[in-house]
């Protein structure tokens, strides 16, 4: 059981039992069992787990863990239609390895160990999402086992089809009927969600259930970021793309975040595949351990690296590289064509991984990864974080994607120390407050899980909170689907399960 008690978060929860199904029938059996005993007033919490890559404790639970590790088959590849059908436990690495034979790929830049079901359930925003779209834009259809064991396939219904679906005398029919009434009654709330600050807290994808033309209704979007609280994804039909061309890179350095922000704002208009910024203190720490950036190393004394990647056709790339160099005329800019090995650019991300696993640090836990911050807010935030650094007496270099506005900071805490665990929780609360004060969202980059669920409530209005609670009840009337995640997260629960030893080999 210990192998299923941790993920990449700061908590550790030992389950009562672990089930490892091989197919959808197995999951239906397990869900019927859990639902039957829940109706007899014995709730066995059910948590689905892919490869255990969650950073927020979403795949941990005290009840039954359903691991999809054996549901890892690629069922069908339609090269002509560019569609692929996979089981939810297929990893991104395996999928793209198979698709490469067809010169296709799923252009989502995430941890290769992530499962497709996990990517949908946690709904991360990757650095390429601005150009290609997040995982949401590549999912055509889902097969889901509901809380009572019923199996459904998501369908985009017309109004006539929706009326027929509502008449079904089973949980699926009650879901469509209840959700349609809920969406209609909360139209103004949903409109505010769609136009509000970018947040993954709750079930914000409810804003995509009823299309703007009011002619179609589809529950598929609700499972993005739901973290197994509404049902268990078993199969996915994905839309895939041709493998993109190898990118060309431009590196610029700046002494301040303000200067870097001015540059990135202009470069973003050229629609790069990726546009990332790194505090160079990250690379100075890596350099102490013999990890270097090759010919990029002399630039390390500047405050911030900005790395831009273009992967359009050759002529468009050449033009955009020239334009980017012109924008950065007052900065130090280097391209992969300028006697710099392409591997040196790839090494930037490798060195970030070295920083995250610094052997001289007790641990840099993923407490505040993937928060959302606008460009203008980023400058204000970089100033405010200096006071946090002073209070903690440690550096907090920022890194992330300007293109998607998703950033990460990794504090250094010794979770084996009681006082340090207390400081970590205080830091979590204060940091989330600073993010909101600067116009950002603490849960902008992925769903909140258990850990971020503690501090995501201020991002929701009372009506939004009530709406999300009602959605949960419609799908999970007996309340046993990952109940301590998202809206069910409590401070007492997280503190009780805080790890007392570090995670080895975790980024």
Could you describe each region identified by the protein language model?
Residues 1-35, 39-44, 51-82, 229, ...:
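N-terminal flexible segment immediately upstream of the FAD-binding catalytic core
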Residues 325-337, 431-447, 477-480:
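Flexible helix-coil linker/hinge segments at domain or subdomain boundaries
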């Amino acid at each position: 059981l210990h192998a299923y008690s941790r993920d990449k978060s700061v908590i550790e929860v030992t389950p009562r039992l672990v089930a490892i199904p091989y197919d959808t029938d197995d999951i239906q059996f397990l869900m019927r069992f859990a639902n039957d005993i829940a109706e007899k007033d014995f709730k066995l919490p059910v948590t689905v787990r892919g490869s255990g890559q969650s950073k927020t404790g979403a795949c941990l639970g005290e009840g039954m863990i359903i691991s999809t590790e054996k549901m890892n088959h690629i069922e069908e590849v339609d090269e002509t239609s560019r569609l692929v059908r996979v089981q939810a436990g297929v990893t991104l690495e395996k999928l793209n390895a198979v698709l490469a034979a067809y010169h296709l790929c799923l252009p989502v830049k995430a941890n290769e160990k992530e499962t497709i079901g996990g990517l949908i359930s946690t709904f991360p925003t990757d650095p390429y999402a601005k150009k290609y779209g997040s995982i949401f834009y590549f999912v055509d259809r889902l097969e889901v086992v509901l809380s009572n064991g019923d199996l459904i396939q998501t369908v985009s219904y017309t109004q006539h089809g929706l009326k027929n679906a509502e008449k079904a005398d089973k949980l699926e029919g009650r879901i469509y009927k209840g959700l349609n009434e809920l969406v209609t009654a909360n139209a103004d709330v949903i409109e505010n969600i769609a136009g509000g600050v970018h947040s993954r807290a709750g079930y914000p994808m409810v804003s995509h259930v009823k299309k703007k033309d009011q002619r179609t209704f589809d529950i598929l979007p609700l499972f993005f970021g739901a973290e197994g609280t509404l049902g268990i994804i078993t199969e996915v039909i994905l839309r895939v793309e041709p493998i993109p061309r190898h990118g060309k890179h431009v590196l610029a350095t700046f002494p301040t975040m303000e200067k870097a922000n001015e540059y990135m704002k202009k470069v973003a208009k050229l629609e790069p595949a990726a546009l990332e910024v790194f505090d160079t203190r990250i690379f100075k720490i890596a350099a102490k351990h013999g990890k270097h950036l090759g010919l990029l190393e002399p630039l390390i004394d500047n405050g911030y690296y900005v790395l831009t990647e273009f992967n359009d056709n050759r002529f468009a790339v050449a033009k955009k590289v020239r334009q980017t160099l012109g924008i950065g005329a007052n900065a130090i800019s280097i391209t992969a064509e300028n006697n710099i090995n392409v591997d040196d650019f790839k090494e930037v991300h490798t060195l970030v991984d070295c920083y995250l696993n610094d052997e001289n640090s007790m641990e840099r836990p993923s407490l505040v990864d993937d928060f959302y911050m606008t460009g203008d807010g980023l400058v204000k935030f970089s100033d405010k974080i200096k006071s946090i650094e002073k209070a903690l007496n440690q550096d907090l270099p920022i890194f992330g994607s300007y293109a998607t506005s998703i950033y990460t900071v990794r504090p250094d805490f010794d979770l084996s120390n009681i006082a340090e665990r207390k400081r970590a929780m205080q830091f979590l609360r204060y940091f989330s407050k600073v993010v909101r004060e600067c116009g950002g969202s603490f849960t902008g980059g992925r769903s909140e899980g258990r850990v971020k669920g503690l501090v995501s409530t201020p991002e929701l209005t009372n009506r939004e909170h009530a709406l999300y609670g009602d959605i949960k009840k419609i799908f999970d009337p007996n309340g046993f689907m990952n109940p301590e995640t998202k809206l069910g997260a409590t401070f007492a629960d997280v503190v009780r399960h805080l790890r007392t030893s570090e995670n080895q080999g975790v980024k």
